[in-house]
Curated annotation (Swiss-Prot):
Species: Lactobacillus helveticus (Lactobacillus suntoryeus)
This protein's record includes keyword Signal: no
Name under which the protein is recorded: Beta-galactosidase small subunit
Sequence similarity: Belongs to the bacterial beta-galactosidase small subunit family.
GO molecular function, one term: carbohydrate binding
Keyword Transmembrane: no
Catalysis performed (reactions): Hydrolysis of terminal non-reducing beta-D-galactose residues in beta-D-galactosides
Function: Component of a beta-galactosidase.
Length: 318
């Protein structure tokens, strides 16, 4: 089909919503609770559904100060998500209920729109529980504005990070970003310089005991480059890219070959698994790394994330 009028082709599946246009196809799964497929120019960018992330691999300072024990609930909340609500809006039509089978039979294969918005609400597996929401807003050229809202609640333990984790099917060959030089954290930004930077591969800082690393604060734009897919008949090995841009404010990110849990599970650098995928975390709030004296003193309070306050951030996929 030739998409010449900048309209979205909306496909109301039995348990999914398809949003197609020129050179892009997106599938949102009601069953899995999120964006299941993100294809751009025929290349798949998702290995699994993006989810809220609340855990980062603990640092020497975290372990020395006991932060890992205080925040342990967030590890479970990071590993397991519970989607409790899905809301859909196409153009100005606000769906009172999801258009799943058999309700979707009223729609044809020729449904078009200028915009679509779908939100997924998740309940954290913590005590007390709270909610986080991821909202996808797609415009007529296929740009996706992604917004995450974390709803603060009294009585929750301190947070390591608030973000969205996107796991990609294969390892990136590198990434380019516009922001601050080097690895930066809220309490480690003073020496950084603004500019445009290129990183080869997916480097991991070789600590004796693997830990949190690779965060980049206050980023305006990020482009991730890959050359391989999981499609056995796709043997082009030509570079293809996905870009993430700031929305209202700069974002923070890490782009590593491991999840926080994989880093957490290894007691030595050589115990990390073979590099297979790309783990992108876009973070709205990041806890500082501390290290004031002998890696035992807590992070200064200015660099904590208050779990009782609401947090919101956005970025644009294109």
């Amino acid at each position: 089909m030739d998409y010449t009028n900048n309209q979205l082709h909306i496909i109301y599946g039995d348990a999914t919503l398809g949003v197609n246009g020129k050179d892009f196809q997106y599938i949102f799964s009601y069953e899995r609770g999120g964006l299941e497929s993100l294809k751009v120019h025929g290349k798949e960018w998702l290995y699994r559904v993006p989810t809220p992330t609340f855990w980062r691999a603990t640092t020497d300072n975290d372990r020395g100060s006991g932060f890992n024990l205080k925040a342990a609930q967030w590890l479970g909340a990071d590993m397991f998500t519970k989607c409790t609500d899905i809301h859909l809006k196409v153009d100005r039509h606000d769906f009172a209920e999801l258009p799943i089978a058999p309700f979707n039979n009223k729609f044809s294969n020729h449904e078009y729109a200028k915009s679509a918005e779908i939100s997924f609400t998740y309940q954290t597996l913590t005590t007390p529980a709270t909610n986080a929401k991821i909202i996808y807003n797609i415009d007529d050229v296929g740009h996706i504005k992604v917004t995450m809202r974390y709803y603060g609640k009294k009585g929750l333990p301190p947070l390591p990070v608030i973000g969205i984790r996107l796991i990609m099917p294969t390892a990136a060959t590198g990434f380019d970003y516009e922001g601050l030089s080097g690895e930066t954290y809220p309490d480690r930004m003073a020496g950084a310089k603004e500019g445009k930077f290129h990183i080869d591969g997916l480097p991991v800082t070789e600590y004796l005991v693997p830990q949190e690393n690779g965060m980049h604060m206050q980023t305006k734009k990020l482009t991730i480059n890959r050359e391989t897919t999981q499609n056995n008949v796709d043997r082009t090995n030509e570079k293809f890219s996905l870009s993430i841009q700031q929305a209202e404010k700069p974002f923070n990110f890490s782009c590593l070959p491991y999840t926080a849990e994989e880093l957490e599970n290894a007691t030595h650098i050589e115990e990390l698994p073979l590099v297979r995928r790309t783990v992108l975390v876009i973070a709205g709030a990041v806890r500082g790394v501390g290290g004031i004296d002998s890696w035992g003193t807590d992070v200064e309070s200015a660099y904590h994330i208050n779990p009782e306050l609401d947090h919101e951030f956005s970025f644009i996929l294109n």
